[in-house]
A protein has these predicted regions:
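Short, solvent-exposed coil/turn segments at beta-strand boundaries
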Residues: 36-39, 61-69, 85-90, 134-135, ...
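Gly/Pro-enriched, hydrophobic low-complexity segments
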Residues: 131-186
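N-terminal leader/targeting segments and the immediate start of mature chains
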Residues: 16-63, 186
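An acidic-aromatic
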Residues: 63-118, 174
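Solvent-exposed loop/turn segments connecting transmembrane beta-strands
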Residues: 50-54, 76-80, 147, 173-175
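Well-ordered beta-strand positions in beta-sheet-rich domains
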Residues: 56-60, 81-83, 152-154, 177-179
Length: 186
């Protein structure tokens, strides 16, 4: 009788391990859609927190099938019109008599203007650590690489699996926030 009871307990434990995490499946489906897309477009509002000061700006973004992101700064008016491209190998800015002067974050690992590119790169290839419900949204936590000094990104997606908000954390501290609007995968 003890053996049967032990066997039943083991079966219950093993049955619990076989359950599927639907939120992880949704996160992986979003990744697959991004990897298979020819392009993606979205608007971002970015807030960079330096502790003693905060910078905010808005960008229109378009990515290609390789994850390269072209952008145009739309707000504030003082830097509107600056364009650029960010890729794995680096980036370029184009402007007339205006310069983006944002100090680097995360021990010189991250420029705030690269936040949209990092959002897509992380969704496409980062180390997915968790996914679960957060109110009406799903929260996905992803590290940008498998190293100890990885940036962590918490991304909230709506019911249609479109990113709507993200936080970039460095050593557990929120350094950048991103609001995402009009996210479209083509």
């Amino acid at each position: 009788m003890k053996r049967i009871g032990l066997l039943l307990c083991m079966l219950l434990v093993l049955a619990g391990c076989g359950g599927k995490n639907r939120d992880l499946e949704r996160a992986m489906a979003l990744r697959s859609r991004l990897l298979g897309a020819s392009e993606c477009s979205f608007r971002t509002g970015i807030t960079a927190d330096y502790g003693d000061r905060v910078h905010t700006f808005t960008m229109e973004n378009q990515s290609d099938q390789n994850g390269n992101v072209s952008f145009t700064v739309s707000e504030p008016e003082s830097i509107a019109g600056i364009t650029g491209v960010i890729r794995d190998s680096g980036g370029e800015l184009t402007f007339d008599d205006t310069a983006l002067a944002f100090p680097m974050l995360a021990d010189d690992h991250l420029a705030p203007v690269s936040a949209p590119w990092l959002l897509l790169k992380t969704l496409r290839s980062g180390y997915l650590t968790s996914a679960g419900k957060d109110g009406d949204l799903m929260r996905i936590t992803i590290d940008d690489r498998y190293e100890d000094d990885a940036l962590t990104m918490d991304i909230w997606v709506d019911r249609e699996d479109r990113p709507v908000y993200a936080e970039i954390l460095w050593k557990g501290e929120n350094i950048l926030t991103i609001t995402v609007e009009n996210f479209q995968i083509v």
